[in-house]
Structures are given as structure tokens and as C-alpha cells.
Amino acid sequence: MTAELQAASGGPGGLEADCQVLNKMKEITGIQDADFLHAALKAAKGNLMEALIVLTEERDQEPVQNTAAAEPSSWEGSAVGKEPPQGGAAFDPEKKGDVHSAVAYGQLESPKAHAAERPQEVHSPEHKNRSKRKRCEVWGENSKQSDWKRVGDWPVGMKNIGNTCWFSAVIQSLFQLPQFRRLVLSYSFPPNVLESCRTRTGKRNIAFMQELQCLFALMLGTRRKFVDPSAALELLRDAFKSTEEQQQDVSEFTHKLLDWLEDAFQLAVNVRSPGDKSENPMVQLFYGTFLTEGVHEGNTFSKIETFGQYPLQVNGYRNLNECLEGAMVEGEMDEETATQSVKYVQERWFTKLPPVLTFELSRFEFNQSLGQPEKIHTKLEFPQTIFMDRYLYCSKELIQTKREEMKKLKEKMLVLQQKLERYMKYGSGPARFPLPDMLQYVLEFITTKPAGAVSSACVSSTEDSQMMDRQSQGESLILGTPSQPDSMLDGKDGKPEDEAVLLANSSPQQQLNAPLQPSEPPAEMSDCPAPHVVSEEEMNLVTTCLQRWRNEIEQDVRDLKESIARVSLSIDEMYSDPHLQQVPYHLHAVLVHEGQANAGHYWAFIYDQPRKSWLKYNDISVTESSWEELERDSFGGLRNASAYCLMYISDKVSHVVAGEGDGSEVGQFQKEVEALPPELRRYIQEDNWRLEQEAEEWEEEQSCKIPSTASESQELSPESGLDPPAAHEQSLRSLSSEHAMIAKEQTAKAIANAANVYEKNGVEAALCEAFHEEYSRLYLLSKETPTPQNDARLQHVLVYFLQNDAPQQIVERTLLEQFADKNLSYDERSISIMKVARDKLKEIGPDEVNMEEYKKWHEDYSLFRKVSVYLLTGLELYQNRKYKESLTYLIYAYQSNTTLLKKGANRGVNESLITLYRRKCLLKLNEVASSLFVSCEEAHVAEGISILNELIIPCMHLINNFDISREDMDAIEVMRNRWCSYLGREDMDASLQIRLGELLPRLLDGSTEVVVLKEPPKIRPNSPYDLCSRFAAVMESIHDASTVTVK
């Protein structure tokens, strides 16, 4: 951790290793193993900061081990992992998964649950400091109609009524199933059924179905951007109230919801066929059966059971097929018959699969020692299409045969890997290395000449051997064999202290190579090691033997790798038999949980058949997504977000949904609305009428604010020196015209320089001369070597285009448009040249210049200028210690700059400069907020909380949304640690402890919120020269005043 971060930490020296501290360490690091955390704290001698540093280094290895889940950040890509310091040598991250055994379901976030997890926290009923994350609150006094009005046929979101994001995820996934949607909307029963239903449960189920009908009707026909599910939720909540008012888990809520629907449909079914559940449409859609066969104490048994949501364990499995295989086969092999068929205690086979197949992933377990649930964050992959043939009873004989084949292949794979490991980890001592490389090193030693020989050959030879060593290690890693000896991981090499520190801060690959790398030799010993005396005959004999042995061993290694590859391919293709691909199920929805067991957020990814794309349903927000984003958020292993429920639909259901998607979705929804009963249609109409009333009232309120808003917009017009009367005119011009106006002084100078040509040869010759002279000037300017104090792109749009290799037609049209700008009406010469330039612009046809591409280039330059202005303003404010204002500018500069850098390195500004000062500003602001909070003065405390809620936490979440760097991650951990250090302080008032307990869940949960950070006021530079002079002044000030170098 850098000195800068250490200076910002400000925490106490140590805390007791009690249950509260372990809970805090779990939330900060994401590690759930209490024994592992306790060992870390003990090794750090009770120092919480040292323990967190070690744990953070251990945790940083995980993204590299699971690179398939997400793209690595810039600091992750260069190393396989980090070796722990000597103080933490006893920790083994691989042992984390062994602790998890029993799996329980995760609970919803609640004050009671927080109290169980953090005994020191006291929760007030009002939650004044937003201890609960209300992600739906993106509207407010200054919201626009677009924030709450539906756009076209886009699906609607669902309002979060206080920790009800799980309900939105479940209901949205069910609503997007046409069969289920129609079942709910067409639900009806004779009036006498309601009269004869006297039980409270029956009446409640009917009431819930009626509320769900109204909700689904609104989701079809509303003009709102999101709907309010309060009525249906109240019925659910009332059903779970008990004398102890305990919080129920999400899975139980979901099961109860489906049970109520089933019971409601059964009331209607009983009118025709009393007691016949097979006619229940919910059973037909969501329920299947499986056969359990096995042997218990020597006796065989067989039974058929019904299932709805099928539970699957996650721990110990890599993908969904492995989970299913583990669930279908339980028991151990009979060793006496190992050479014969494989015997299992119990096997399950699906005898009937439902059209909608739901898998419930058990990602929660109950920790008996802590007395609270914990979440399992391990990675689990699942496919978009899964073939269920291998789990069907009709495939039993074929699958049992393949399981025997699979067992033999895995045994063969194990033998081959063990053989290969003997080659790749050769030696009898604690440090072992690849045998081919060891022979190569000996060969290099033999052939090295004594002192006085050319040293470059020695260096070259050493580099070549290191390269081969890296390649060998990389291959062994790919094949799943360890590439590090245990002694290296334990740090027991007996090296000097400074070398041990170097090893602790290097990657395992670098540590493996460390003994083979030549250290910097002293001046008097500049030669490589070499034999003292060796005859030509001895050298030839040893060289011949070493080369022959090395070739033999390399051939053995290649043969082993080829055999492993063949066996691995056979394993991968074991179930690729066409006979086992007749029952496909397609992924319909993925329900995701983010956070810990007792606190978190839920959302859903649902495949939209009409649009042929994935949509993300996150409370009121419904946005277009991708399979790549779904993988990152759902597979787990990297962050604390992972799927907890998968919903697959059969091929038949998928075809029905796809068939409906052939036409317009809005047309399909309209047809369903027209088919609704009259009372539901009237309900939709009334809600839409209320929306129009609300819109009219909103417009009346906004009309009172128009004068002040207009004057404000004129005062802060972007990027130009226009007077207020010209603001409206500027908004109507294209960006290219705006850029021409910005450069009008330079264009006017070019016209003035062509005055002689104008007098001698006329207007066209003057335009041609001025055009070529200006082009030559800008071209040379674009080729100048940039300096930290000078960015030529700020001077002119064409410099930006030329440095980014814009098409020549776009460059020429842009420059011609500069001379056609009507703002050049200074004199007769300028007006004449302007008219000729305009005529030439009209002659350029659409085939010569792609106007869409032309527009995009000018949009990029406009965004570049905006980023530059925001960056300069942020840096100036930072130097003036106005950290609140500075941070907002820097955050917006980074977000816009990221968009530009995706198109090319020269499209945006120096990203490292923005991230450095954004980080420094955030740390300074956190220091200010925390100091205000502990001041015990109410006004200062309120201000500190306001800074934390409105700036620091939103900015932390925005940083997490991008590829976060190691420095940013360390900074976030430092800020969290500072606030955690205030827990349990005796000198802090009890009311402050309550407020702190309410703030910490949002601060510690690194999940992505729907963050709406108000954009800062726009700043207008008077001219390009003004912008360049400000840039030079700020950069000169930074480099003179700061010792931090920007890489």
C-alpha cells in the first residue's frame, strides 16, 4: 500500500479478535471462512490493518484464477498471483472452499438481520441516513418526464418498496413467459366459489391472484416507465408476520408465491375435478417428477417424487452439468467391484420434465460458529442451452455406460498428469523445476567460457532459458498442474530479509524464475559462472549426452501433453452424442443476488425473444444487456454478485415465445390488452388517465421555473464565447459549424495571409491558397511531439482528426466548412471567400463524404473538449482545495473519457492523470467527511454524513462499475477501514454509533447502485488559446508542486 494511502487511513493500531471484528473483516474482504480470518488476525498479532492488507493480497489472486468470468483489469493481467508475506505464510486460499458444508438459503436485508450480524449496531426506524439502498429513487424535484414515462413498447420496471427487489426479479421473469401471463390474466372462477370459500387462506390466495392480475394488466398496457406492486406485496408480507416477526428468506418467499398461485388455480379446478392436481395449470407448467433408485443397507428401493424448483448445490462444482450430475448421483463406488460396473448408493432420473424448468442454486450456508448465514461466492458456469437427455430415465442404460467410461478416463487423466508433474517438478529437494530446463541450464553452464569471454552471450542464454521456463510453466498451468513448489509458497528459502520482501511482492512466476536470474554483479565479478577447467573431449561428451537426454525428455513431455489433450477431449465430448441432444432447454431468465447473506440486492436477466437480446431488469430500470454482462454478473467468483436461480424453458415453449416475437411486441401487447376482461381494461385506462393528470401538474410546476432556468443556461453555455442572445442560435447549428466558429480567429488569419493572392488572382485562388496554407500549418502542428504542458488537439479540430487518422474526405470538408462559416463576415474579401467556399460545399455529393461518419467525428471532438474542460476545472478546484466540486468534475471527465478511449488511444486525454487526482480528491474528501463526523457537533456531523452519502459512496460505486485499478481498490479499502475503525470507540456518542451502523452497509457493499450524480455546471472557454493556456498553467503547476509522477 502506498504511503499516500497509509497517511489517509487514520485508523487505530489494533482491535480485539472478537466476533464483531471477524464480521467486519468478512464484509470488507468478501472472505466468508471465519477460521481463515481468525488465523489472519492472529498472524498479524491483532493488528486489523495488517491482517486486511494480507487478506486483500490473497483475494487479488482470485480474478486471475477465474479469467473466463470477466476481463481482467489493467493491473491483473501481468501476474498469476501474489505470494503472501512471511507473516501470512500459514494461510492457504485453496482451503477456503473446504469449510463450506451445509447449504442454506440467503435472507432478505432487514434491521433484524443486521442486528444479528452486527450486535453493536442499533437501527432507527426512520433510516434517516439511507442505511437501506433504495435503488428506485432516481427521480426527484428536477426529474424529467422521460424518467417516469414509458417509451414505446419497452418493458416496464417495478418500484422497489423497501427491500423488495427480489419480488421484481421473480415477477418479471414470470411475466415474460406468455403462457404464465395468460394464465394469470385469464384467471376466473364462478361467484359461488368465493362465497363458499370460508377459510382465511383461500380468501387470501384469491385476493393475491386478483392483485397479481391488476399488476400484470398494468405491465401490459401502462404508459408509465415502472409499476407499483405495493398491494400484492402487502399480502405476501402479512402472511409471514409471526409473533417473533422473524425475517424469512427469499427462497421461502418465492416458494410461497408459487404455492399461493397453485392453490388459487386449484380452487377453480376443483369446480370441475375436485382434488385433481394434474389439471392444475401451475402444476402442468412448473412441476415435474423424478424417480429415485438406490440401495439402503443392502435393500433396493424406488420411489417417484414431484419437484418444482429443483435445488442444486454449488460448492465443489464448476458448471451446471456438474451440479446436476452431483444431484442425480449420490454415494460412493464399491472398491471390490472397481474393475466391473460402478455401484452407487442412490441415483435419480427425471421421468417428466416441466415446460419451465427452474434450478435453485444454493449459494448460502449457515455458519454454526457465528450463528448466521454466509454466502458462497465461488464461480459456477451455465450454458444458454442445456440438453436434459443425460438425466432422463429413458437414457439410463446409456448414461450408466458413459459414467463408467468417464471414470476410467478420469483415472487415466490422473495418471498422465502425475507422470507429467514428475517431469515439470523435478528434484529431490524442496525447490523443484522443469527437467528439460534444468538440463538446458547445465548445458549452458558447460558451454560458457571463463572470464574474459563475451558476456552478452551469457545474458542472452540466460534470457532464453528464462523464456523457455516461462513457457513450460505456462503449459503446466494450462494443464492444471501446479507450477510452484510448496516451499516457495511458504517463503522458507532462508534468503536475506530484503530478498524475501522482493519475493513477497512479485508474482509466483517471477519467484519461480528468481533463483535462475543473474543478479546485478559487482564491477570486479562481471562474468557468468563457468567451468574452471574443461577439455574439448569432456565438453563434447557432456554436451552430446545432455542434448540427447533433453531431446528424449522433451519428446516424452510432448507425448504426455498430447495424451492428456486427447483424454481431455474425450471427457469433454463424452455427452456430445446426438442421441443425448434431443431434449434441449433454453435459458429464459437468470435471477442474480449481489451482496452478502444478510444484505444485498436482486435483479434479473431475461431473454427477450422479439428483440433477440438479453434485458436487465433492475427495479425500475430495464436496460439492454448482453451475454457477456450476464456472465460477469451471474457466474460469480470475481465480485459478490452471482446467480441464485436459473429458469430454463423447453424447446416447445421457446418456439411459442419466438413465434409470438415475429411481429411487433407492442402490437402483441395491445392484442392481449384488448382481450382482457372489461374491469382490467378499465383499470389500465384509469391508471393512464392519472398519469396524464400527474404529467399536467408536473408541467405546471416546471413552467414556474422556466425563466430562471433559461437565464442560467445562457450564462453557462458550453464551449463558446457567445453572447446570451446567440445561445438559441448556437443550439440549432451543427457541431461542425460550432467547431468552425471556435476556430474562426485562426481561419480569419489564414484569409488575411492570402490577401496578396486575392488582389492578384481573384477569390477562388485566394481560397485555394488560404486552404492549403492552413492545412499545411495544422498538419505540421499535429506532428509536433506532445509535452505534458501542451496538447495541440485543443487548438484545432483538424489537429485532433489528423492525429487520429480521420479519413481525408472528412478532414478536407471540415476545413472547407471553416472558410464557409458566416461568422467570417469581416470585410469584402472574407465575405467573397465565404461564398465561394459555400458553393464548393454544395458541390460535394453524399457519395464523396459519409455524413454519418462526419457527424460522429465531430461528436467525438466535442466530447474531447468537454472532457478537457472538466479535467482542467477539476484540477484547478483541487489545487484550491475545493474537493467536493473537483470530484464531480473528475468523475464526469473519466466517464466521458472512457467512451473516447474505446475508439483509440489518441481520442481522449491521459486517463492516468484523471484517475490519480480522482483518487487523491476522494481520499481528501473522505478525510474531511470522517473528521466532521467524529467532531460530535451536530452541524458538522450532518455535513460529514451528507458528503459521504451524496459524493463519496456514489463515486465509489461508479469507480467499481469500470475496470478498477489496484490503486483505486486500495483507496476504497482505506476509506472503508477508516469508517470501520470508529466502531466500538468508547469516546464516541451512542447516537453517532447508531448513525455509523446505518451508513456502513452502503459503504461496505461494493455492488453497483443505480447512481445518479448531478452533472457539474458547464464551463465555457473563451477560445482555443484560452483553453490551451489554462491547460499549460495547470500542468506546469502540477509538475512543479507534486512529487507524484503520472505513468
Curated annotation (Swiss-Prot):
Which gene is the coding source of this polypeptide chain? USP28
Q: Which protein is depicted? A: Ubiquitin carboxyl-terminal hydrolase 28
Task: State its Enzyme Commission number(s).
Answer: 3.4.19.12
Specify the species: Gallus gallus
Function field:
Deubiquitinase involved in DNA damage response checkpoint and MYC proto-oncogene stability. Involved in DNA damage induced apoptosis by specifically deubiquitinating proteins of the DNA damage pathway such as CLSPN. Also involved in G2 DNA damage checkpoint, by deubiquitinating CLSPN, and preventing its degradation by the anaphase promoting complex/cyclosome (APC/C). Specifically deubiquitinates MYC in the nucleoplasm, leading to prevent MYC degradation by the proteasome.
Positions of the UniProt region annotated as Disordered: 60-95, 110-138, 461-528, 694-735
Q: Which Gene3D superfamilies match?
A: Cysteine proteinases, DNA helicase RuvA subunit, C-terminal domain
Q: Active site located where?
A: C165 (nucleophile), H601 (proton acceptor)
Q: What GO terms describe the biological role, i.e. biological process, of this protein?
A: cell population proliferation; DNA damage checkpoint signaling; DNA repair; intrinsic apoptotic signaling pathway in response to DNA damage by p53 class mediator; proteasome-mediated ubiquitin-dependent protein catabolic process; protein deubiquitination; regulation of protein stability; response to ionizing radiation
Q: Which domain of life is it from?
A: Eukaryota
Q: Which family does it belong to?
A: Belongs to the peptidase C19 family. USP28 subfamily.
Keyword match Hydrolase: yes
Where does the UniProt entry say this protein principally localizes? nucleus
Q: Where is the composition biased (Basic and acidic residues)?
A: 111-128, 489-498
**InterPro entries named among the record's database cross-references:** Papain-like_cys_pep_sf, Peptidase_C19_UCH, UBA-like_sf, UBP14-like, USP25/28_UIM, USP_CS, USP_dom
- Record key words, sorted: DNA damage, DNA repair, Hydrolase, Nucleus, Protease, Thiol protease, Ubl conjugation pathway
Biased composition regions of type Polar residues, renumbered to the chain: 461-486, 504-516, 705-717
